[in-house]
């Protein structure tokens, strides 16, 4: 097929516009995104530190929570630093290889997070529906296999997206009206047919819908088991056990659902609304997850409080030693 002279099969770089229509507000929009990133990093690293240092938390539930915290750090780090570069210092250019790398990590961590939420739903299901067999079913080996499966599944689904982009020729327009590189945003810049890319995108959406369906079915069984419990206190305790996970599920899938609905059916919705929803989908869950678990999970809350009190006690001892001598 003949291509025009200005065609580059693989361009040297792309230009990320940020949030089209809100360019004058970029510098101010950057501050809440920076705050979100700081909270996400501090919160998730705190959870990882607490789980690592406290042996009482070496249980399947907290191993899955550690996986969630790791994917949250990866997802926020893959998106927000570049976003802040666009907002604050007009660093809009991104080389082709870096764009593909960012796309890979964003989609990879998104699929990993969805899979971890499925694993956590299974953990809750076993804990509520088969409590006596919990330790026999969810052994350390099983948790390790699930963790490996989360990683491998994401790779299997994401690697084709890179190959599908590499096969496309890119014509004159190298401007991406977004804050980060993502599969369909890049595909739409191509001058070739992107039918296969669209089919791949629909398969990826079906993958997330499958995860949501599995989680929903798990909680249907959980609720049935909970309402069969003999006492009101037992029912409340069981529901509280699942409360944190439900909040995390809503924090992850709700922005994603709104983003998908406006992208597919909101043709009259301004572009900046699409971009803001897409950003919420990848930056809000990493911030909310550690806050939700820190507040709602007693073991995490107690361990963080214990560490803080120990540090305060050490500082007080050092102060007394210095004042005495």
Curated annotation (Swiss-Prot):
Membrane topology qualifier: Multi-pass membrane protein
Record's GO cellular component terms: plasma membrane
Pfam short name (any one): 7tm_4
Residue pairs linked by disulfide bridges in the UniProt entry: 99-191
Major localization class: membrane
InterPro entries hit by this protein: GPCR_Rhodpsn, GPCR_Rhodpsn_7TM, Olfact_rcpt, OR51/52/56-like
Taxonomic superkingdom: Eukaryota
TM ranges: 28-48, 57-77, 102-122, 142-162, 199-218, 239-259, 275-295
Entry keyword set: Cell membrane, Disulfide bond, G-protein coupled receptor, Glycoprotein, Membrane, Olfaction, Receptor, Sensory transduction, Transducer, Transmembrane, Transmembrane helix
Single Gene Ontology MF annotation: olfactory receptor activity
Glycosylation sites: 5
PROSITE patterns for this protein: G_PROTEIN_RECEP_F1_2
Subcellular compartments: Cell membrane
Topological region Extracellular: 1-27, 78-101, 163-198, 260-274
Regions of this protein lying in the Cytoplasmic compartment: 49-56, 123-141, 219-238, 296-325
Family: Belongs to the G-protein coupled receptor 1 family.
Function: Odorant receptor.
Protein name: Olfactory receptor 52E2
Provenance organism: Homo sapiens
Lineage, opening ranks: Eukaryota, Metazoa, Chordata, Craniata, Vertebrata
């Amino acid at each position: 097929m003949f291509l025009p002279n200005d065609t580059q099969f693989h361009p040297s770089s792309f230009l990320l516009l940020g949030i089209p229509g809100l360019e004058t507000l970029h510098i101010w929009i950057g501050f809440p995104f920076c705050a979100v990133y700081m909270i996400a990093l501090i919160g998730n690293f705190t959870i990882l530190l607490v789980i690592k240092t406290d042996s009482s938390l070496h249980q399947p539930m907290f191993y899955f929570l550690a996986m969630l915290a790791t994917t949250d750090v990866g997802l926020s780090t893959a998106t927000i630093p570049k976003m802040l570069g666009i907002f604050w210092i007009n660093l809009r250019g991104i080389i082709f290889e870096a764009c593909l790398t960012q796309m890979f990590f964003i989609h990879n961590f998104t699929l990993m997070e969805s899979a971890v939420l499925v694993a956590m739903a299974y953990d809750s299901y076993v804990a509520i529906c088969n409590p006596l067999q919990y330790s026999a079913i969810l052994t350390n080996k099983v948790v390790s296999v699930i963790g490996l499966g989360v990683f491998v599944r994401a790779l299997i689904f994401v690697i084709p997206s890179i190959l599908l982009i590499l096969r496309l020729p890119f014509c004159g327009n190298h401007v991406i009206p977004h804050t980060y590189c993502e599969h369909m945003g890049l595909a739409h810049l191509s001058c070739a047919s992107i039918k296969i890319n669209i089919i791949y995108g629909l398969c990826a959406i079906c993958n997330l819908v499958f995860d949501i369906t599995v989680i929903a079915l798990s909680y249907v069984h959980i609720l049935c088991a909970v309402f069969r419990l003999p006492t009101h206190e037992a029912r409340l305790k069981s529901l509280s056990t699942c409360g944190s996970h439900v909040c995390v599920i809503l924090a992850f899938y709700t922005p994603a659902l709104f983003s998908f609905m406006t992208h597919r059916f909101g043709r009259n919705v301004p572009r900046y609304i699409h971009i803001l929803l897409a950003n919420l989908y990848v930056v809000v869950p990493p911030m909310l997850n550690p806050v939700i678990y820190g507040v709602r999970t007693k073991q995490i809350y107690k361990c963080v409080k214990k560490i803080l009190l120990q540090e305060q006690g050490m500082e007080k001892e050092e102060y007394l030693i210095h004042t005495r001598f």
